[in-house]
């Protein structure tokens, strides 16, 4: 019996697809995340994200669109404390995600659904420069493999591996209410030794790299509003299972639009729209929406 190349590639990808829908990319930033609050401030944030996808492109292959799709809903609770350490502003924080993956299919093949806790994220940005109008920060992120993971399933919320992301970025005021934020990061992956079953299938992944740029405008006449436009590019992240490439990577270009409003001096509501314009090695997000609510203390 012979199997076509396209069918073979779909089968291989479907067997290991759990990773493509998890946060395997580097860390996304909102438009003013690198502007710190004063030392002594606490912040609680809640994120609610919905995304829909209707095509998948394996690395170096053709787009698979017919019978392909995946929806997800993810909520994240985040706690941040800003403090002064030896003259530098530091913000230790923890992020706790909970997600659901559903309506998954690839080339007509149904994918498992999944729900549960995601991998907790620990981070502590350090602002090396924190001047009026200019900031520059070093931001490490540690992903702890404590999320929901069922070995061998095509979709999982947790990743069953350690990850470490190192990010550099800063903000520069441009005048007349305009601000730009630029950042770059590199993400290192540990191995998942249970990728295809308990104790079977060793998944390895190359480093992922990402650039993000934002331009924001806050009306001088009403500084409770901010509108922002952004772009992100990711590359690298090619995956192998037991030494064989599985058609997945983290190569993408994405555009973003964000609107935020302080409804009180300590409560901000923010909406974010994202859309992939190019993907090689994964699902293409047609629509990615996020509602963020932040409370400062």
Functional labels for PLM-detected ranges:
Residues 51-74, 109-113, 155:
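Surface-exposed strand-loop-strand hairpins of Gram-negative outer-membrane beta-barrel proteins
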Residues 48, 81-83, 126-128, 168, ...:
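Residue-level signature of outer-membrane beta-barrel architecture
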Residues 57, 63-65, 199-297:
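Outer membrane beta-barrel transmembrane domains
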Residues 48-54, 96-102, 128, 142-148, ...:
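Transmembrane beta-strands of outer-membrane beta-barrel pores
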Residues 23-45, 53-55:
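Outer-membrane beta-barrel biogenesis signature
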Residues 54-55, 87-90, 132-135, 177-180, ...:
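Repeated loop/turn-to-beta-strand initiation elements of outer-membrane beta-barrel proteins
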Residues 99-204, 248:
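Outer-membrane pore/translocation modules
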Residues 40, 69-75, 88, 111-120, ...:
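Residues that define the transmembrane beta-barrel architecture of outer-membrane proteins
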């Amino acid at each position: 019996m012979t199997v076509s190349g396209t069918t073979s590639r779909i089968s291989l990808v479907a067997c290991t697809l759990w990773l493509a829908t998890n946060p395997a990319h580097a860390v996304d930033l909102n438009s003013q995340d690198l502007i710190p609050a004063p030392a002594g401030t606490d912040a609680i944030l809640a994120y609610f994200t919905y995304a829909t996808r209707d095509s998948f492109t394996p690395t170096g292959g053709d787009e698979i669109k017919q019978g392909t799709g995946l929806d997800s809903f993810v909520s994240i609770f985040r706690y941040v404390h800003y403090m002064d350490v030896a003259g530098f502003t530091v913000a230790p924080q923890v992020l706790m995600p909970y997600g659901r993956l559903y309506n998954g299919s690839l080339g007509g093949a149904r994918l498992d659904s999944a729900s549960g806790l995601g991998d907790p994220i620990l981070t502590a940005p350090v602002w090396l420069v924190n001047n009026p109008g200019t900031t520059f920060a070093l931001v490490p992120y540690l992903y702890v493999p404590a999320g929901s993971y069922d070995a061998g399933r095509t979709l999982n919320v947790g990743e069953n591996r350690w990850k470490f992301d190192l990010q550099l970025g800063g903000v520069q005021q441009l005048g007349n209410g305009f601000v730009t934020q630029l950042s770059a990061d590199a993400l290192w992956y540990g191995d998942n030794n249970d990728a295809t079953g308990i104790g079977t299938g060793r998944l390895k992944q190359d480093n992922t790299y990402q650039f993000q740029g934002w331009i924001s405008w806050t009306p001088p006449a009403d500084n409770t509003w901010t509108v922002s436009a952004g772009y992100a590019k990711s590359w690298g992240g090619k995956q192998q299972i037991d030494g064989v490439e599985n058609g997945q990577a983290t190569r993408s270009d994405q555009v973003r639009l964000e609107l935020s409003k302080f409804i009180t001096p300590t409560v901000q509501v923010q909406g974010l729209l994202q859309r992939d314009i190019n993907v090689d090695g994964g699902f293409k997000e047609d629509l990615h929406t996020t509602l963020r609510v932040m409370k400062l203390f």
